[in-house]
Amino acid sequence: MKVTDVKVRKINGESRLRGVSSITFENQFVVNDIRIIEGERGIFIAMPSRKTSKGNFRDIAHPINSETRQIIENCIKTKYQDLLDNPPQEEDFSQNSEN
């Protein structure tokens, strides 16, 4: 499956959570709430999950093989790094005195 879109939202704060991402495949299927986490060995990607009644976490959606996982991780990490290197410009909505 071809990745056709990746969106990343940076999270500022003191937790290890650095951002949240969504990834779209073939303009037909999207996976939301992929977490970007700062671990002891750098950034890692955590697929969306839910907590079970026993306190364990189970992925809601995840890649079936390591090749697909690598593609997803590379796309998200690249987009996240691009966001860090080129933060979006804040728009100025102040009144223009020339009006």
From Swiss-Prot:
HAMAP family: SpoVG (MF_00819). Belongs to the SpoVG family. The keyword Cell division applies. This is Putative septation protein SpoVG. GO terms for biological process: division septum assembly; sporulation resulting in formation of a cellular spore. InterPro entries: SpoVG (IPR007170), SpoVG_sf (IPR036751). It comes from the Bacteria. The keyword Cell wall biogenesis/degradation does not apply. Keywords: Cell cycle, Cell division, Septation. Could be involved in septation. It comes from Aster yellows witches'-broom phytoplasma (strain AYWB). SUPFAM superfamilies: SpoVG-like. Pfam families: SpoVG.
